[in-house]
């Protein structure tokens, strides 16, 4: 199913309604399309949120996805205890293992993912069979090369995966 929205408010209302009607944990990506939706949110989200992917850059780099969500936590729109992300600036296998154990216990029903400029989502640039829910990649075709991301296996367990694409040549947004 494909939906086209005339403006960001329509998309925001639609996305918030999906989140509100679903109390299960959510997987949400970073990226500009997602930021454009969530920067206008004014209602508290009580769901557990897993950040789908993170770039391995310095903790306060503008390239980090979690910094945007930290702002939502400070505004008390997301509960800190309900936000799960990879917070280290480098790959740490022990930390990744702990994060996997936490993620494996959760039953995600919905994923809300922005589509990147080259069609990628959640730092997944190629099909990979990963046995764990969250893994590291060292060869991303986009900067930076080193990232952590949710596996396709874990994503496929969601009942609903929403892809948000910003159509730059048009003045509307789409969900695919």
Regions found by a protein language model. Give the residues of each.
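N-terminal glycine-/serine-/threonine-rich phosphate-binding loop
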Residues: 1-26
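Conserved acidic residues
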Residues: 24, 109, 159
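Glycine-rich beta-strand-to-loop/alpha-helix junction loops that act as flexible
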Residues: 27-33, 113-117
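Active-site histidine-anchored catalytic micro-motif
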Residues: 39, 50-60, 121-125, 160-164
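Short, conserved loop/helix-junction motifs that constitute active-site signature segments
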Residues: 41-48, 77-78, 153-159
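Ligand-binding beta-strand-loop-alpha-helix segment within the catalytic cores
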Residues: 45-112
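Class I SAM-dependent methyltransferase SAM-binding "motif I" and its flanking Rossmann-like core
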Residues: 111-113, 117-153
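ATP/nucleoside-binding phosphotransfer catalytic cores, i.e., glycine-rich phosphate-binding loops
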Residues: 157-176
């Amino acid at each position: 199913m494909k939906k086209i929205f005339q403006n960001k408010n329509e998309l925001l209302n639609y996305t918030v309604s999906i989140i509100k009607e679903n109390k299960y944990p959510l997987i949400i990506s970073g990226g500009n399309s997602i930021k454009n939706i969530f920067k206008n949110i004014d209602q508290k989200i009580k769901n557990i949120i897993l950040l789908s992917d993170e770039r391995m850059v310095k903790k306060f780099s503008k390239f980090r996805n979690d910094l945007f969500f930290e702002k939502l936590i400070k505004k008390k729109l997301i509960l800190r205890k309900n936000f799960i992300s990879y917070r280290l600036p480098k790959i740490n296998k022990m930390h990744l293992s702990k994060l996997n154990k936490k993620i494996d216990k959760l039953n995600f029903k919905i994923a809300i993912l922005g589509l990147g400029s080259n069609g990628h989502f959640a730092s997944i640039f190629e099909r990979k069979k990963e046995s764990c829910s969250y893994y590291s990649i060292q060869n991303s075709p986009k900067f930076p090369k080193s990232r952590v991301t949710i596996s396709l296996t874990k994503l496929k367990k969601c009942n609903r995966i929403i892809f948000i694409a910003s159509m730059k040549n048009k003045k509307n947004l789409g969900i695919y």
